[in-house]
């Protein structure tokens, strides 16, 4: 089901985005309108792993995975990767507000208000009051 998806860890197939071919495994085409081709981002590891290994995290934009080296004659090597829901873009860039007050109890621009950090506009203490 949706809660025990492809990764077998109880969170693999959450959301319909996991079904998009460009978002989960397979080849990812790269198109550029620039005169200079994209160079990309590289993440390298020179560690030896034995047994099952699961790595999770976030990388900016699209990602690919590759394996180089010698595999033993017994066993297998597989890379499964996911890279979001296929909808790429920067949705917002915001600066940090100026917090003015004694030990964080003051009014900050665009941030929380007053004692215990009750917030405005979706920013708050997480206590469920606002």
Swiss-Prot record:
<comment type="similarity">
    <text>Belongs to the chorion protein family.</text>
</comment>
<feature type="region of interest" description="Central domain">
    <location>
        <begin position="23"/>
        <end position="93"/>
    </location>
</feature>
<keyword id="KW-0677">Repeat</keyword>
<protein>
    <recommendedName>
        <fullName>Chorion class B protein PC10</fullName>
    </recommendedName>
</protein>
<dbReference type="Pfam" id="PF01723">
    <property type="entry name" value="Chorion_1"/>
</dbReference>
<feature type="region of interest" description="Right arm (Gly-rich tandem repeats)">
    <location>
        <begin position="94"/>
        <end position="130"/>
    </location>
</feature>
<dbReference type="GO" id="GO:0042600">
    <property type="term" value="C:egg chorion"/>
</dbReference>
<feature type="region of interest" description="Left arm">
    <location>
        <begin position="1"/>
        <end position="22"/>
    </location>
</feature>
<comment type="function">
    <text>This protein is one of many from the eggshell of the silk moth.</text>
</comment>
<dbReference type="GO" id="GO:0005213">
    <property type="term" value="F:structural constituent of egg chorion"/>
</dbReference>
<dbReference type="GO" id="GO:0007304">
    <property type="term" value="P:chorion-containing eggshell formation"/>
</dbReference>
<dbReference type="InterPro" id="IPR002635">
    <property type="entry name" value="Chorion"/>
</dbReference>
